[in-house]
Amino acid sequence: LCLDVGQGDGFLLRSGTTNILIDSGSSDQKKLGSRTLEPCLKSKGISRLDIAVVSHGDSDHISGLLYLLEQKMPIDLLILPAGGKGGEIYGQLEQLQTEAGGKTYYMHQGDKIKAGEMEFTCIFEKETEEERNAHSLVLCSHYKDLHILFTGDMGISEETELLDLAEENGSIQQEHLEHVQILKTAHHGSKGSSSPAFLEAMPLKAAFISYGKDNSYGHPSGQVTEEMKKQNISLYETGGKGAWTLESKARNVIIKRTVKSRGEN
């Protein structure tokens, strides 16, 4: 489920009884946690999470999760970027998780985690980069025949580094990129991410772009959306269109709208 969080990011993955949240924050929905995220989870009968992943610590990726942690929602494992260890916001998240009785792990490039039938591999992460967007976790999720790439707010510089690593035969970057069908577009479709070379490196069928309608940043960039259309990548945008459900059945993937955005007729 690609959540409609306004100007931010949020993805909920489910397989059987396994529930995983990847980011959940917004810069324009000040009560995202209580008004959107918590009601969404309750409507699906979710009272605990197996894993919550923070790609990086910007508020438009964590504000909803912060609320859940403050409410002491049970989260078995909180995953944070190793590059952010020692940063104030990551320390705050870790402390709240500890107080709620859960474990925290700082993820490194090459790490793998399994949850139910889902497997997650970190294929890129800058451990020495202080700038949050640049140390975003880049995760490839693998569920049966479905591969999704989650990119946080990585920029073109990081994409280039990732592609350089992928040129090495047998590398985890090459192994995973060549199978990615679905992309969670970096940085809300900003022109500072999603270079043509990066998009071309994957056999992409679809891309999700999460952003707030009429946002002041100009997201998504027309340059990015036009390039995706040029490469025959189907676009699924939250701004003005709401949340999207992605369902994997056998070898088929079904994507459909689920919730209308606020103010939409």
Roles of regions detected by a PLM:
Residues L1-N265:
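Non-globular, low-confidence helical/coil segments that flank catalytic cores
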